[in-house]
Amino acid sequence: MRSAKVGVARQLETKKPQTGRKISTSSRGTIHSQQSQPEDIQMKYTRKELKEYRQLFNMFDTDGSGAIGNEELKQAMISIGLHANKAEIDNVIKEVDADGNGEIDFEEFCACMKKSQNIVKSTNEELIRECFEIFDQDRNGIITENEFKYIAKEFGDFDDELAEKVFRELDVSANGHLSADQFATIVEDYLLNDPKHDIDTGDSDVERYDDRHDDRASPMPNHLSTVPE
């Protein structure tokens, strides 16, 4: 299922914000993540968040001093998918660097990561809404099979057979359309995962689709003509 979702969302590449790299684990990061955290931090973040933040923090705290500089923090923010301009990143840092000493301790780092992730989430939600409107030509709140196939063929270089196969796999309720929630799940899956996967339809057209799209993205205009009934 996931591979087909990737195939649908790949045609939205030009709108897609860059996703952050996966946080690598190391023995050093694992040791630090198992250390006890201050109680107030444990109340603000989930155990999973603290583990990921600690691993990422340790990647940049190379001297083990317990603090990182602003430049390292910027790189950490970018690595989780926040591709804002310098002024926006500086504003986030200014908000979390409570003592203003230009060094970020782990507690400040956690606050910055959480804020950055919220910004990325908001950006992704706006992206999903815009993409849904591109497919939903008649603005009735659902994407019909004809609407899906039209966009997929016109701007994703799908042929009829591949477009139909992908739609049928995504239409898990088999009612002939995709709801806004279903579409959001498809695009969120694409934004959060590596798009370099094949569509598992068992058809040679899939490989040709991947070959055509490895090095370029399909343009997505702001306005499209009416989809044929």
UniProtKB/Swiss-Prot annotation:
Keywords: Calcium, Metal-binding, Repeat
SUPFAM superfamilies documented for this protein: EF-hand (SSF47473)
Biased composition, class Polar residues, residue ranges: 21-39
Region of interest (Disordered), residue spans: 1-41, 194-229
Binding residue positions for Ca(2+) 1: 61, 63, 65, 72
Keyword Repeat found: yes
Keyword Metal-binding attached: yes
InterPro entries the record matches: Centrin_CML-like (IPR050145), EF-hand-dom_pair (IPR011992), EF_Hand_1_Ca_BS (IPR018247), EF_hand_dom (IPR002048)
Chain ranges passing through the membrane: none
Segments of skewed composition (Basic and acidic residues): 194-217
Gene Ontology CC entries for this record: centrosome; cytoplasm
Residues at which Ca(2+) 3 binds: 136, 138, 140, 147
A Pfam family this chain is assigned to: EF-hand_7
GO molecular function, one term: calcium ion binding
Chain residues that bind Ca(2+) 2: 97, 99, 101, 103, 108
Domain EF-hand as annotated: residue spans: 48-83, 84-119, 123-158, 159-193
Full protein name: Uncharacterized calcium-binding protein B0563.7
Organism listed in the record: Caenorhabditis elegans
Origin organism lineage: Eukaryota, Metazoa, Ecdysozoa, Nematoda, Chromadorea
